[in-house]
Amino acid sequence: MSSLLIEGGRPLSGRLNVEGNKNAALPLLAACLLTSEECVLENMPRIGDVAVMANLLREVGAEVDGVGTTTVRVRCRTITSSEPPAALVGKLRGSVLLLGPLLARTGRAILGMPGGDFPARRTIGTHVDALVALGARVLPSNGHALDTPDGMKAASFYLDEASVTGTETALLAAALIDGVTEIRHAATEPHVVEVCTFLQRMGVEVQGAGSSTLRVHGRKNLKGATHRLNGDYIEAGSWAVVAAVTGGEIEVRGARAEDVEGIAFVLKRMSVECTFEDGFLGIQKS
């Protein structure tokens, strides 16, 4: 589709439920590679990016069931390849999240240039620097190739930017390292907190979730886990804003109150009648 034709002038009204947060879905799928046991992810968004990530997991040895539904099951008994197909990697920016799990389980990761956003605008230097701090070595490559000739070791380091996927890459790599890894200048977004929660269910101790300093007590063997994704607060907020600017009334369910509070605060400051509580965001005519 090259263009969208939008006929405005009508209030947007109604009720809807948001699905799980896409920005949490991709790192959670990558985290499933950290264990040989089955992981179950519920309330998954039914979007193309999830299907692409599922195919990437299959290419490195995982069994993935339920794609296209809201419950996805992943089991990766053995990593069969440390180099997912470059063509598939090129379809998804989130493919960079495979670096940490592949290095942690196999000591090697080769990744073509991640797709999605224009590379000049978003690099993965922060991700690579974090992995190097944990013991990885950068190899000559047209994309990104790393190995760990002396193994991975716990470390304390400062991220040069509070990158979400950079923080998640560091978390996923540190999860399988014995000892305590300290990540400073970490991203604090709700989906980063959700990754911390999932890792804790797998047996990792994570301190400081939601703050800019994370302490990860890793372990060599992680267990499988079940996790229900939080609702996508960005989608919820988008619907709320559209309803507000068109003079409509809408009820959006599925997002947590603490995740939509900032959106509600701004709307109220603009004199929009807005109510929010856990699992509910409402916009009234104003």
Show the residue positions of the predicted features.
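Short, structured segments at the rim of ligand-binding sites
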Residues: M1-S286
